[in-house]
């Protein structure tokens, strides 16, 4: 890992730690407002605060399982209590009663309900459909399934991923594409192998193709398989790995797989499309939706991406778009003659909750001339 990346990661961990401490302190105060603690504080003030802190510390046990998830839970609890504090001020303005106990219970119920829905949206995989038309000739109408951001080990282990591939097979795709972040640093080798075997069971007209995302090669050394073992497992199961490669499929359409922008030596969209027959439909796979201008200039017909997780935790998506972190967060748009589709992903990184989006795979029907 480079020195600059080490510094950035260290700074992020420090910021997360400070945020967790601040949230924890506020939550201790909120817990202490409950009448049972107020009654105890009249006799044993120190004990009442210690018990309130103990309850919040129990929540901190999640840190041993998943620090990002703990941070999400803490932030939403804080938001819930702050919202009810605001409602309490409004009630007080109109001289209406809203006791501390009721406010606290409502905050807990609201937060639990919101995060519960987020869990459902993360674990339940939806099928999203798109229909495109082109003036270019195709040997046959084309149905492709785009899968991104499995991050095996978060909401999908190898067996659950295999069950999703049964659903994909039921859609009768002509082509299946894996648009990066198939695995992560915490993915177990067993799950990786099971998922690769599941991809190998897919019966399609034109095969299964894979491009790397920023997590597939791994950021750390503790993963129990290498990027070479991942590639071997994919290829042994009939999955074609494209790394800055252009292929003409059935003399009908081009499939272009880009090296991820996190990797060195990445070719430009112009270089990858140089020499292609412009009368044929072109599909470009690029994990991160960050190069729309040059991809549109290269006159690609369809660009498929993932990476953003559709925003994952609200309001990360709108903030990322406002900061120009990506050209698009989710869905379809057209620039010139190029259609861009970003899928929210079949899972997501680290946090088994989605409040800004939902898990999906995309079924895309392309109707030719």
Question: Language-model segments: what does each one mean?
Answer:
Residues 1-123:
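Non-catalytic terminal accessory segments
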Residues 27-31, 127, 293, 303:
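Generic preference for hydrophobic/aromatic residues in regular secondary structure cores
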Residues 56-72, 92-103, 127-129, 133-142, ...:
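Generic structural signal for short, solvent-exposed loop/turn connectors between secondary structure elements
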Residues 91-148, 153-171:
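N-terminal signal-anchor transmembrane helix
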Residues 136-369:
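Soluble catalytic domains of enzymes that build or remodel membrane lipids, polysaccharides, and related
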């Amino acid at each position: 890992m480079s020195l600059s990346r080490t510094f950035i990661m260290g700074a992020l961990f420090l910021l997360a730690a400070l945020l967790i401490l601040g949230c924890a302190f506020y939550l201790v105060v909120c817990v202490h407002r409950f009448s049972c603690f107020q009654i105890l504080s009249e006799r044993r003030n120190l004990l009442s605060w210690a018990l309130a802190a103990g309850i919040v510390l129990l929540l901190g046990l999640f840190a041993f399982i998943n620090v990002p998830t703990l941070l999400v839970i803490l932030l939403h609890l804080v938001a819930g209590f702050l919202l009810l504090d605001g409602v309490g001020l409004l009630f007080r303005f109109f001289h209406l009663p809203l006791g501390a106990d009721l406010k606290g219970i409502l905050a807990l119920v609201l937060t639990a309900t919101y995060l519960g829905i987020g869990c459902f949206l993360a674990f339940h995989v939806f099928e999203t459909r798109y229909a495109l038309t082109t003036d270019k000739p195709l040997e046959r109408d084309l149905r492709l399934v785009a899968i991104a951001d499995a991050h095996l080990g978060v909401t999908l282990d190898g067996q659950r991923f295999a069950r999703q591939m049964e659903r994909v097979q039921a859609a009768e795709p002509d082509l299946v594409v894996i648009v990066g972040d198939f695995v992560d640093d915490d993915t177990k080798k067993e799950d990786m192998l099971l998922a690769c075997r599941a991809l190998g069971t897919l019966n399609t007209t034109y095969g299964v193709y894979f491009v790397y995302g920023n997590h597939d090669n791994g950021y750390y050394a503790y993963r129990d398989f290498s990027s070479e073992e991942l590639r071997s497992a994919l290829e042994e199961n009939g999955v074609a790995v494209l790394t800055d490669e252009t292929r003409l499929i059935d003399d009908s359409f081009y499939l272009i797989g880009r090296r991820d922008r996190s990797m060195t030596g990445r070719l430009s969209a112009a270089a990858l499309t140089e020499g292609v027959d412009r009368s044929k439909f072109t599909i470009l796979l690029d994990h991160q939706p960050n190069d729309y201008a040059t991809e549109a200039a290269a006159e690609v017909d369809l660009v498929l991406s993932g990476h953003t997780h559709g925003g994952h935790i609200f309001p990360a998506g709108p903030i990322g778009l406002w900061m120009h972190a990506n050209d698009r967060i989710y869905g379809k748009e057209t620039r010139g003659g190029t259609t861009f589709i970003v899928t929210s992903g079949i899972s997501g990184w680290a946090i088994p909750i989605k409040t800004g989006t939902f898990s999906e795979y995309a079924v895309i029907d392309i109707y030719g001339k």
